[in-house]
Amino acid sequence: EMLKYVIKYVLDNCPEEINFCDQFVEKGLKKKLTDLVDAKFVRISHHDIVDILLKADQKWEFAPSYDDDIAKEHERYITEYFNGPVFIKDWPKDIKAYYMKVNPDNKTVAAVDLIVPVSGELMGGSQREENLDVLLKRMEEMHVEKDGIEWYLDTRRYGGCVHSGFGMGFERLIMYLTGVDNIRDVIPYPRTPKNCEF
């Protein structure tokens, strides 16, 4: 809903900018954005995504695997396959962060990525592990050092609760909204080598 709201807000309040980008940056941008606002977002597990990729009559640069992340080429194929945005949920626990809640199957975590046509991954999130003992065991399994993150462990030690979080790639959203195809052209604060004096 948030993404749809933001895109609709931009379409309603920045028509000149969208028309400019539609004409000079990405032909069909306005339709792409309108289609996303009207789209039903598919929700599907990582395992089922890999099933689709393995059955595809496609030669992949990076072979799809149930134990790995999906590549940019896979994201592109999946958004075309479903003709719109896709929430990929229940990721393999071994490729995700230690603080993500492990699902009852003990193979996946309660994590989700949102991929959109052309741009790929736009958002990622997960339910966090609220149980200190489970979190410590997971850190040990993944060889995560406790040094420097005692404050984080204290949030579980002194009254943690069930919670989730997500992050959105701001620059990727701006790319999607404007049709600009290089992330360096949309970053608000340029990051150039040897240009940040301390």
Residue ranges of predicted features:
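C-terminal substrate/ligand-recognition segments
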Residues: 114-124
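Conserved aromatic-histidine-acidic binding/catalytic patches
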Residues: 37, 123, 127
